Amino acid sequence: MFAKDAQLISNSYYTATAQALPQQPSLQGHIQADVCVIGAGLAGLSAALELAQSGFQVTLLEAKRIAWGASGRNGGQAIVGYACGEEPFEKAMSMDEAKRAFNLTIEGLDLMRERIRQYNIDCDWVDGYMTA
């Protein structure tokens, strides 16, 4: 991680309001797993959950704490599309492939909604949109 990124994390709302966690020992010895997921941000947690639900024995490793990096620095918005916009996708692939890539972001939001319902997560989800 770059020093600039570390400062962003230490000055984030997430860091300022997160409850202190008890120290956990580093992983010692050997463990057995079908899959090891490294990083417990939204992507890593999602991958680990999906794999575990499919019957795999999963080990999830995180250096800091859950959602410590980019997942903890956002303002809580889950928005369709990509930060770079659609143009790079349209240049790199066919229009059908670019549309499929965009549709993956819609499916991602649908999956988040489903998991919120499935696990009864109290997160004050509000559907909306942003324009700038």
Q: Predicted segment positions?
A:
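Extreme N-terminal leader/targeting segments of oxidoreductases
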Residues: 1-35, 53
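N-terminal Rossmann-like FAD-binding beta1-loop-alpha1 element of flavoenzymes
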Residues: 30-60
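Dinucleotide-binding Rossmann-like beta1-alpha1 core, especially the glycine-rich loop
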Residues: 81-132
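Short, hinge-like loop/turn segments at secondary-structure boundaries
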Residues: 75-80
